Each structure stands twice: as structure tokens, then as C-alpha cells.
Amino acid sequence: MATPPKRRALDTVGEKVLRYETFISDVLQRDLQKVLDHRDKVYEQLSVYLQLRNVIERLQETNHSELYMQVDLGCNFFVDTVVPDTSRIYVALGYGFFLELTLAEALKFIDRKSSLLTELSDSLTKDSMNIKAHIHMMLEGLRELQGLQNFPEPSPH
């Protein structure tokens, strides 16, 4: 006996709903998480460079030739150390490369690097907003496909 047309339509609607839900959870949400994780790493790098800028500015203000400090060797194990010459600093360029720079050169590098990281974080934020818009569009499509009514947004109190 043949399946009635209405039953076949419901089966295809159910299959479409399942495919859309799978696409949302397996592709879009995973992509969104990757973009947000990448943006968080960029924010961490930006934070490190801004901290370095503050340290360099304090070094320039105090004009000390020696610096006493504690260095973290790992696992929160600190040792006291003396930096004999604070006129030059080693800056991590990336990919394991370090460069010895004067404090003024380091500030220029930090300004350029922080502006690039800010642009990258802005781009990643736009990408995440696009992915969120795609997720919202897919959910609206699912709502229409299932014939659900649009529920009102909860009002903020």
C-alpha cells in the first residue's frame, strides 16, 4: 500500500528539520566556538602587549639603570633577579623569535602590534556576529517549517 501524500510531506518536513538542526549544531555552533576561542586568544595577546607597554612606560618614567624584580620560572615558582641595564628589552615577535629593542623601539612595535591585534579582534567579532545571524536565520526557518508561532522576547526588568 502506498504512503499517503500528507504522511510523506510530514516525513520530509521531519527530515528537513533534522538536517537543519544537525547543520546548526555540527557546523554553525562549532564554527562560532572556534571564532570565539580565536578571538579570546587575540585578546590575551593584546593584554600581554598592553601590560608590557605599561612596564616600559614606568621604566622610562623612573630612569633607573638597574631593576630588581621577581621572575616566574613556572608553576608560580619565583626567584629574585637584578636587571643591570634597563635601556634595552627583548620583545617576543612571534613564532619563537625575540628581538632586542630600545624602549622607544619597543613602544613603536607594541603600538603597531596592538593595532593589528585590535583589527583582528574586530574582524573576528564581525565573523562571530555573522555566524550568530546565520544561526538565528536557520532557527527562524525551522520555526516556520514546523509551523510554530513567534514567541515574544522576554522584556528586561
From Swiss-Prot:
Taxonomic superkingdom: Eukaryota
One GO location term (cellular component): cytoplasm
Transmembrane residue ranges: none
Xref: InterPro entries: Prefoldin, Prefoldin_subunit_alpha, UXT
Signal sequence residues: none
Pfam families named in the record: Prefoldin (PF02996)
Subcellular location: Cytoplasm; Nucleus; Cytoplasm, Cytoskeleton, Microtubule organizing center, Centrosome; Cytoplasm, Cytoskeleton, Spindle pole
GO terms classed as biological process: apoptotic process; centrosome cycle; microtubule cytoskeleton organization; negative regulation of transcription by RNA polymerase II
GO molecular function: beta-tubulin binding; chromatin binding; transcription corepressor activity
Main localization category: cytoplasm
Keyword line: Activator, Apoptosis, Chaperone, Cytoplasm, Cytoskeleton, Nucleus, Repressor, Transcription, Transcription regulation
SUPFAM superfamilies: Prefoldin (SSF46579)
Function: Involved in gene transcription regulation. Acts in concert with the corepressor URI1 to regulate androgen receptor AR-mediated transcription. Together with URI1, associates with chromatin to the NKX3-1 promoter region. Negatively regulates the transcriptional activity of the estrogen receptor ESR1 by inducing its translocation into the cytoplasm. May act as nuclear chaperone that facilitates the formation of the NF-kappa-B enhanceosome and thus positively regulates NF-kappa-B transcription activity.
Subunit-level organization: Homohexamer. Component of the PAQosome complex which is responsible for the biogenesis of several protein complexes and which consists of R2TP complex members RUVBL1, RUVBL2, RPAP3 and PIH1D1, URI complex members PFDN2, PFDN6, PDRG1, UXT and URI1 as well as ASDURF, POLR2E and DNAAF10/WDR92. Interacts with LRPPRC. Interacts with androgen receptor AR (via N-terminus). Interacts with estrogen receptor ESR1; the interaction relocalizes ESR1 to the cytoplasm.
Family stated for the protein in its record: Belongs to the UXT family.
Descriptive protein name: Protein UXT
Species, as recorded: Mus musculus
